Amino acid sequence: MRTLANLIDHLGADFDFTVITRDHDLGEEEPFFDGVGAEGGGAGRAVGKARVWYLPARRLTMGNLRGLLRSLPHDLLYLNSFFSVPFAIKLLLLRRLGAIPKVPVILAPRGEFSAGALAISPVKKICYLAAVKMSGMCRDITWQASSHFEEQDIRRIFGDRASVVVAPDLPAVARPNVGAPRRLEKMPGELRVLFLSRISPMKNLDGLLLMLNGMTEPIQLHIYGPVEDLAYWEKCRTIIQELPSNVMVEYQGAVAHGVVAQIFAEHDLFFFPTHGENFGHVILESLTAGCPVLISDQTPWSALEENGAGWAFPLNRPEFFQQALRECVALGAAEYRDFRKRAQGFARLALQDEHTLQANQGMFALALQRGR
């Protein structure tokens, strides 16, 4: 996950990170490697500034996780989700039962408590939240909120006494000597639109397609990302088949992160009407590549229009999104070059925010202090 990779890149000189994760990507069955530290006695694999243990599904049992956590010395447990069964629910339960070391815990819910996220499979989530509250599993943990909005979401569920630290997600570390991606010129009367994300209800691809259904201008949409929910993807495909002839749609599948910047550069607009993002690294990646964005107002990126980098609109106003699309279609090459420069300038401001790094460092220090 990009968020965790960026965190380790920034803080890897201050902390020794050991990562436990699945041995395959979302929607894939082939493992990254064979038997890397998953069985007894292994030392994991060195990846950047961390050691990573890649576990196959058969090793994500309570017993194996217990053995692994007891064998790996650690001073703090960082959980990158609240609703993940193997990497949150099982670990919190093991800790509550005293089966693994009771070290301090930081839990980053990654937007899982937003109204949009909780509305997906709500019964299961409500039942689990009730069980967690009754058990006291989260009573002594430190919560990471990526924004003040997420802090409110956490406190709405766990109360004002919950220990919540606002530490925004860290951007990618700047890489030296990276060449600028090749760009395609924007001509008036055309628009190359990109959707790049996991294909799931939370990301709202169906909402995007329905907005395009009301357009009369020529638009080309490329969809990139792994299919997380097959039934949802079939729903999207049905909408695609009903789109007017002026809207051309192609699904390009999942994509390696190393070519993402080039993909953004080949498009005129990143269209991402998500139901909620606690940060939205993909939005920053788009801006960094000089691709303006058209997104929902359910992310921290609220100052796009005032910085000339794009738009953020409420999802209940589809006509706002459609008007922005029409404005983009009408723009010519020179106007769009300026648009791209403003997007990159806004990205540079976000990347230079030292407060974000200090907030993350302080969060770890506070959690460790609470555990003494």
Place the predicted regions along the sequence by residue.
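Short hydrophobic beta-strand element within catalytic cores of glycosyltransferases
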Residues: 292-296
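Glycosyltransferase donor-sugar binding loop
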Residues: 21-26, 196, 220-237, 253
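Membrane-proximal helix-turn-helix segments that form the acceptor-binding/catalytic region
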Residues: 6, 125-143
